[in-house]
UniProtKB/Swiss-Prot annotation:
Residues 27-37 have a biased composition (Low complexity). Residues 72-94 are annotated as: Basic motif. The gene is XBP1. This is X-box-binding protein 1. Isoform 1 is ubiquitinated, leading to proteasome-mediated degradation in response to ER stress. X-box-binding protein 1, cytoplasmic form and luminal form are produced by intramembrane proteolytic cleavage of ER membrane-anchored isoform 1 triggered by HM13/SPP in a DERL1-RNF139-dependent and VCP/p97-independent manner. X-box-binding protein 1, luminal form is ubiquitinated leading to proteasomal degradation. It comes from Bos taurus. It comes from the Eukaryota. InterPro entries: bZIP, bZIP_sf, ER_Stress-Reg_TF. Isoform 1 interacts with HM13. Isoform 1 interacts with RNF139; the interaction induces ubiquitination and degradation of isoform 1. Isoform 1 interacts (via luminal domain) with DERL1; the interaction obviates the need for ectodomain shedding prior HM13/SPP-mediated XBP1 isoform 1 cleavage. Isoform 1 interacts with HDAC3 and AKT1; the interactions occur in endothelial cell (EC) under disturbed flow. Isoform 1 interacts with the oncoprotein FOS. Interacts with SIRT1. Pfam families: bZIP_2 (PF07716). The lineage of its organism: Eukaryota, Metazoa, Chordata, Craniata, Vertebrata.
Length: 261
């Protein structure tokens, strides 16, 4: 039987006392009907110490020397039940939080899919407008690499816009024809004179190059015999080497000092 008894302390935040009545064991020495006191801490916010802001002192651990082994086992079992219930509550709160996160992520995914679909439709409209502008300018519609890749996937994504296409195709065909018209107005006589002048220049250049090669080939064999003859003459008549004059050792030398007996 569990009995809740108020604490003797007049404070509102004092701990409560639970009295657990245990049955007598066969081998235990505890009397029948003995109550097991269990201290349950009260709310800390209602205590005067918590209201004043002073940190509470560490409560000394209560010695259980006055309890029998059965009472100790019952007290340990109660504490284990409280810890298990706390763990279950914490797990339940965590699971509910994860479920809420999953719901939020699914909603965000749906929003992103809708936005992606709108962008695809807008891109398709820009592609159609680009093709119409190309047809108005008299040019064939060009298929980009992005179109080739998206056709395999079944999507119509295309990189670019109508403005870039208009900038690339700004020059019409009339301007191209106006640029080519000066070349068409040149007379054939002028073209013939230009070709003859070019041919004469090339022939003169070829003649000069062959003439310089022939002159260099004629001068080289004539210079070779003279160089070889001069080399042979230097080898046959070398300059004789004269040894330096050495004067005999005598009194005329400044360092003359004979040994005197």
């Amino acid at each position: 039987m569990v009995v809740v008894a108020p604490a003797q302390s007049p404070a509102a935040g004092a701990p409560k006392v639970l009295l657990l009545s245990g049955q007598p064991a066969a081998t235990g020495g505890a009397p029948a009907g003995r109550a097991l006191p269990v201290m349950v801490p009260g709310q800390q916010g209602a205590s005067p110490e918590g209201a004043s802001g002073v940190p509470p002192q560490a409560r000394k651990r209560q010695r259980l020397t006055h309890l029998s082994p059965e009472e100790k086992a019952l007290r340990r079992k109660l504490k284990n039940r409280v810890a298990a219930q706390t763990a279950r509550d914490r797990k339940k709160a965590r699971m509910s939080e994860l479920e809420q996160q999953v719901v939020d992520l699914e909603e965000e995914n749906q929003k992103l899919l809708l936005e992606n679909q709108l962008l695809r439709e807008k891109t398709h409209g820009l592609v159609v407008e680009n093709q119409e502008l190309r047809q108005r300018l008299g040019m064939d519609a060009l298929v980009t690499e992005e179109e080739a890749e998206t056709k395999g996937n079944g999507a119509g994504l295309v990189a670019g816009s109508a403005e870039s296409a208009a900038l690339r195709l700004r020059a019409p065909l009339q301007q191209v024809q106006a640029q080519l018209s000066p070349l068409q107005n040149i007379s054939p006589w002028t073209l013939m004179a230009l070709t003859l002048q070019t041919l004469s220049l090339t022939s003169c250049w070829a003649f000069c190059s062959t003439w310089t090669q022939s002159c260099s080939s004629d001068v080289l064999p004539q210079s070779l015999p003279a160089w070889s003859s001069s080399q042979k003459w230097t080898q046959k008549d070398p300059v004789p080497y004269r040894p330096p004059l050495l004067h005999p050792w005598g009194r005329h030398q400044p360092s003359w000092k004979p040994l005197m007996n």
